Amino acid sequence: MAAILFCRSQPKPMRGLDLKQNELFSYTTLEQRIPNDHPLRPLRGLVDTVLASMDRDFDGLYSTLGRASIAPERLLRASLLQVIYTIRSERQLVEQIDFNLLFRWFVGLSMDERMWDHSTFSQNRDRLFNQDVARLFFQRIKSLAAWSEYASNEHFSVDGTLIDAWASHKSFIKKDGGDPPEDGTRNPDADFKGEKRSNATHQSTSDPEARLARKSNGDASRLAHMAHTMMEHRNGLIVDVECTEFNGRAEVEAALEMLERTAKPGSTVGADKNYDQKRFVQRARELKVTPHVAQKRKGSAIDGRTTRHPGYAASQKIRKRIEEGFGWLKTVGGLRKTKLIGRAKLSAQLLLGF
């Protein structure tokens, strides 16, 4: 009896109870849930400033008839989240925004607002997620007052990389009426040994704008598009982007187009040996841009008048950082292989990614 009384007199452990009780009311806001030092806070402020400056541009994209659509600002913020958090698909993006309070706050949804369907992105792709809107967004970011504090406007580097297309070798058939391989299954076997295949005679049925490409002699050929970037040298920020088909002239032509659009007279541009061509060097000098290209062993388009300066050595050292942007794009940005068909859509995705 004494033992029983002793047990009953033991203090109760102060352990919380695992009660599953849904609260009817919430006395907090999304704003209170997000830490003041969260890295998305300054990004949200920057994005809101840019989107506010595009208000009149958005008005021109929508009809005056019918019911109101989902705000374009929310769709673009959601697309940025997809890039930043490496979300594989728009279906997954919608699911995560629905239950993630941080994502809801960034997009501009309240805790009670219903999330839209994933097909909304496809329905708005031609209107909102196109090259023109993406480039306008990109240019407005560069026009912010704070941009000049981080980015140089005098020293740049250019380079290109391959982005795998959403197409397989089996879709690469003859242009004169060839048929894809068939064996009665959804994924038929195909043997291309001994067959000469080139972009002049073959074309992909999945993505007609993709080209059979390889970046170097030891690289495997695959269907791809080319992405080109221009990086400033102060902090390694990407200041311009182009998307082209793969051919022997694409890198030089895209680089010159970006120089015409971005570089001012008196600038320098670093590049690898592929840009050590008379056409690139001559046109860069016509734009009053000094070409700090890596020299070929034979037949270089530049000489000691360019390479003797300390700035040339600095450009050759810093230009290699442009590969970091490509690495980020293909890993975090999820663009090692695009899920979109055509260069126009890929170009918009590249601009939002950088």
Residue ranges and their predicted role:
Residues 78, 93, 117, 229, ...:
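Hydrophobic, well-ordered secondary-structure elements that form the walls
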Residues 104-122, 291-293, 299-314:
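Phosphate-backbone recognition surface of nucleic-acid-processing proteins
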Residues 35, 39, 66-74, 89, ...:
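Secondary-structure capping and boundary motifs in well-ordered enzyme cores
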Residues 66-70, 270-278, 297-299:
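Acidic, metal-coordinating catalytic cores used for nucleic-acid/nucleotide bond scission
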Residues 13-18, 28, 43-150, 165:
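Basic, low-complexity intrinsically disordered segments
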Residues 1-49, 192:
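Charged, often Cys/His-bearing segments associated with DNA-binding zinc-finger transcription factors
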